[in-house]
UniProtKB/Swiss-Prot annotation:
Record text about domains: Possibly contains a TATA-binding domain.
Family statement drawn from the similarity comment of this UniProt entry: Belongs to the asfivirus B263R family.
Species: African swine fever virus (isolate Warthog/Namibia/Wart80/1980) (ASFV)
Keywords: Early protein
Function: Putative TATA-binding protein.
Induction, per UniProt: Expressed in the early phase of the viral replicative cycle.
Name recorded for this polypeptide: Putative TATA-binding protein pB263R
Amino acid sequence: MEDETELCFRSNKVTRLEMFVCTYGGKISSLACSHMELIKILQIAEPVKALNCNFGHQCLPGYESLIKTPKKTKNMLRRPRKTEGDGTCFNSAIEASILFKDKMYKLKCFPSTGEIQVPGVIFPDFEDGKNIIQQWVDFLQHQPIEKKIQIIEFKTIMINFKFQINPVSPRVIIHLKKFAALLEHIPTPYPIREIKPPLEDSKVSAKFMVSPGKKVRINVFLKGKINILGCNTKESAETIYTFLKDLISVHWQEILCVLPVPD
């Protein structure tokens, strides 16, 4: 098969944009206490499997592995992170381990503000993130807390997306240096703050400034996988996706190349 034929695409030049992980969030009514005070009030019970805080730890029987313990310092030259208590958890937060559809989620709650974070959300409609927050609120409502707890809002904090070039042959790869050069000279939907050239031919990385103070990173890998990382809305990811899809379609002869047939 000729190289030009190898460079042909299927009917869709790239796969569709997919979310692969999200940090989901929300806000609950203020608990009117600090994490140090709250961890002393809470009594472990279903649906929460474990509670971790820099000032206390609890778990249900059989979930002892979820209890966090202090880590040994590995790099003595690195400036140590400022910690509180035993330093096992995020400062000012209580971490709750909650199960949803066979996946364990680690919810972070900041009691003084009511802010909630749920990393590792994988459902495109955020069903898992919403369910974990609701389970946490249900748990709190059965605790010896005077204030009524309710959900004020749900929100996305950070969403990561991915897609892939879709050639007819696995021998087709992205010429990373040429791809980086195109990003430097072709107008983009958002200003590019930096472009990191390929390191050992592994990937090209670029940062788009999608709003004041908010940067979205793209990673373009040799074999055609493309990640859009750190979005706070699907719309910004779709705008970058459309730009990259058009870039690949128009310049595919420049940025794609064919590996030789192995002996």
